[in-house]
A protein has these predicted regions:
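A short, N-terminal amphipathic alpha-helix
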Residues: 25-44
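N-terminal nucleotide-binding beta1-loop-alpha1 segment
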Residues: 1-14
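Conserved donor-nucleotide/metal-binding helix-loop-beta segment in metal-dependent transferases, i.e.
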Residues: 103-130
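Short phosphate-binding loop-to-helix
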Residues: 60-95, 152
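Conserved alpha/beta core of the MobA/IspD/sugar-nucleotide pyrophosphorylase nucleotidyltransferase superfamily
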Residues: 161-223
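Acidic donor-binding segment of Leloir-type glycosyltransferases
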Residues: 43-67
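Short, glycine-/small-residue-rich phosphate/pyrophosphate-handling segment
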Residues: 141-162
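Catalytic metal- and UDP-sugar-binding loop of GT-A-like glycosyltransferases, i.e.
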Residues: 98
Length: 223
C-alpha cells in the first residue's frame, strides 16, 4: 500500500525533523526499496494499492515494476480491504499486505509469513507499539479491518478480536518496527550503516543526509 510521493502528504510525523522536500525524497527511497523487496520474492504477483487520486502519478513513477490499483473507499482500512479483494478476483490464495514503512524488513520474514498461511487463515506481524506492519490472509474478509488501519496503538488488539469473531485462525510473523517518527529514523540509520544492502536506496539517502549535516556543523555546507 502506498501514496504518491507528494510534499506534505506522506510521512507527516517526520515533519518536525525534516523539511517537506526531504520527507518526500526519503519516502521515495522507502517506496523503491520496499518494491524491490517485494519483487525479490519468488513466484509472487506484486501490486500497489493506493487512493484513486494517486493511481496515474504512481503508475508513471513505478513504470513496469508492478501494477497500480485504486483502492475502494478512503483510509487505511479501505486500503487493506482492497488488497485482499483485488487478489481474490485473481484466485491467488495467499496474500500479504504491507506498506513502505519497513523497507529493511528481512525477506525471510515475508517468506515465513507466506508459509504461516499454509496453516492459518490470517498472519499478522506485530509492531512494538500495539500496531502491525504486515497482515496476510488466504481469502478476502471485508469486515476484518472495519474502520482502522495498521498504525494505531490498539490496531493489533482490534484485528485479533475481529479475527476471533470471524472464527479465523491467526499465526504471527516476527515482531518488527516501521518508520514513523524521528527515533525510528535514527534506529534505521544505525542499522543501515552496518547493513546497507537491506535497503540500499534508503541507506544511500541517509548517508548523504549525514554528510550534509556534518558539513553544516563545520561550516562547509548547509542543510
Amino acid at each position: 500500500m502506498a501514496k504518491a510521493p507528494r510534499a506534505g502528504m506522506v510521512k507527516t510525523r517526520l515533519a518536525p525533523s525534516l523539511s517537506p522536500e526531504a520527507v518526500t525524497a526519503f519516502y521515495c527511497c522507502l517506496l523503491e526499496d520496499t518494491l524491490a523487496l517485494a519483487r525479490s520474492l519468488s513466484d509472487v504477483e506484486v501490486a500497489i494499492i493506493c487512493p484513486d487520486s494517486d493511481v496515474n502519478e504512481l503508475a508513471q513513477w513505478i513504470g513496469n515494476e508492478a501494477s497500480v490499483v485504486a483502492q475502494k473507499g478512503e483510509g487505511l482500512a479501505a486500503g487493506l480491504t482492497s488488497v485482499f479483494a483485488h487478489f481474490a478476483e485473481g484466485q491467488q490464495r495467499r496474500v500479504i499486505a504491507f506498506n513502505s514503512d519497513s523497507p529493511h524488513l528481512p525477506r525471510s520474514v515475508l517468506e515465513a509469513a507466506f508459509e504461516t498461511l499454509a496453516a492459518h487463515d490470517v498472519v499478522v506481524g506485530p509492531t512494538h507499539d500495539g500496531g502491525y506492519y504486515l497482515v496476510g490472509a488466504k481469502a478476502s474478509h471485508p469486515t476484518l479491518f472495519a474502520g482502522d488501519g495498521m498504525g494505531t496503538r490498539s490496531a493489533l488488539e482490534r484485528l485479533l478480536s475481529r479475527a476471533r469473531a470471524l472464527e479465523l485462525s491467526v499465526g504471527f510473523a516476527a515482531p518488527f518496527y516501521d518508520i514513523d517518527v524521528a527515533d525510528d529514523l535514527i534506529r534505521l540509520a544505525a542499522e543501515l550503516r552496518i547493513a546497507p544492502a537491506r535497503a540500499p536506496r534508503t541507506a544511500r539517502w541517509l548517508k548523504e543526509c549525514e554528510l550534509v549535516a556534518a558539513q553544516s556543523r563545520t561550516g562547509t555546507g548547509k542543510l
